[in-house]
Amino acid sequence: MPLSSPKQRETPVSVSKSSAQHDATPSPSSLTPLSAHTTPGEEVSTLKQGATRDEKEATDGGRVEGDCSWFQEQTCGLILECVADMDACFKAFDKDEDGFLNQSEFSALCRALFRNERGKPYPVETSMLNTIFTIFDTNKDHVIDKEEFRYCWQKWIKQVVRPVTALVIVDVQNDFISGSLALINCPAGHHGEEVIPPVNRILEENRFDVVVYSLDWHPENHVSFIDNVHMRSLHSSCKLMCEETQVYDTVIFDVNNDGTPMEQKLWPRHCVQNTWGAELHEDLKVAEDAILVYKGTDPDTDSYSVFWDNNKKFHTTLNEELQKRGVTDVFVCGVAYDVCVAATTKHAIEEGYRTILIDDGCRGVSEEDIAATREHTIANQGLVVHSSQVKNLATGRDRPPALAYKLALEL
C-alpha cells in the first residue's frame, strides 16, 4: 500500500458541500501531498483507489474465487479438505451422505471454520451454534439442504474466510496530539502521539480494501467550543448558567429556540477549519487509496462518529462508500478512544459491520469511559484486539466466533 507523510504544498485538497452535516469546503494543508483528486459535490473525498481484488489475491498466497484448498481443518480426528468449491465443502461435512447437513454436521463445519491463525479451534457455545443453524435453516425442517447451504456459502462462509476490510483512522489531528485539546491535559493523561507508531505499522503491514481518515473540521462558531457557550440560548432545563460553565461540562441548549433540548459537552476550541490544529499529524502515514471524511462542520451540531452526527439526524456518505465496496469488516483506531472512536465503533456495529477495535491504536480522555467502550464493543459481538492481531483477522486466517456470529445475525 503506497504511503506518504503529510507535507505542505500550494494546491490543497478540497471537498464540497453535500449535506447539512458537511457544509464547509475544507482545504487542509496536511493532506496536500497525496496524489488526490476530489469530485465537486462529494462530502467524502476519495483519493486514488486501492489494490484490485486480483492484486490482493496475488499477495495473499494466490487464493482465488472458488478455490478453497487453503481451508484445511482437523476435527474429530478427520482431516477435512475443501479442494474445489461449495459442493466439495458440503460433501466433506455431509458425513451420512444423505444430501443434507443436520445440526451436528453443521456444528462440525462451524468448529472447523472458527480457528485462529495457528489452526487452533475456538471454544464455541452450543447456543451460538444453534442460533447460526436456525438462521440458515430457512424452511425450519431441522436440516440444511443444498439450496440453503448455497445461501450460507455465498452470504456467510465466503465473508468469514475472505472478509472485505476497511481501516478507519479517527481524528489523528494536531490539536488532539499537542494542541488546544491535547489528550495529555485530559483526565486520563494519555499521550495522543502514541497511536501513530501502531497505526503506521498497521498501514505498512496490511492491504485493506479501503482506508478512511476522519477529521474534526469545525467552523469558528461551533457549538462544542466553551468560548461560544454565550452564542446560543440555554434550555430551561439546564442547571448551569453561561458564566458557570467549565471545560468538560455538559449543558443543554435550545439551539432552534423552539423548546427542543440538545445536550452538548463543552470542549476547548479545537480543529478549526483550515488551521494547523485541524491538520493530520505530520508523522501519520497517509495511504494513497484513502477516503477522507470531514465531520462536525455544522455550527449547531457536534459529530463524534465518522458515520453520523451526535443527534443521528445527518449521516456522512461513509456507509454508502463502504457498501459500494462490499466491506464486511471495519477496523477502528485513533483518538479519542472514548469519544469519537467510541461513537464510530458503536455506529459501525449498528450499521451491521463486523467491527474490530484496535486497542493499542487508540488513546482517550477518561479511563472509566475507555473501559466502557471496550465493554460495549465486546457485548455487541465486536472485538477489541492488539495491532499485532490485525493481519490475521484481515486476511481471514484468524476467524473468531464472535465476528462470524455477528455476520450471521445481520442476515
What do these predicted regions represent?
Residues 2-7, 13, 37, 43-97, ...:
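Active-site acidic carboxylates
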Residues 18-23:
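Intrinsic disorder/low-complexity segments enriched in small, polar and charged residues
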Residues 151, 197, 313-320, 343:
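Short, contiguous clusters of charged residues that form electrostatic/catalytic patches at enzyme active sites
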Residues 269-274, 307-311, 334:
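Short, surface-exposed loop/turn motifs that are enriched in glycine and acidic residues
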Residues 300-329:
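Alpha-helical scaffold elements lining the catalytic groove of polysaccharide deacetylases
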Residues 326-343, 357-362:
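Glycine-rich anion-binding loop/nest that anchors nucleotide
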Residues 341-351:
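Short Gly/Thr/Asp-enriched flexible loops that form oxyanion-binding sites at enzyme active sites
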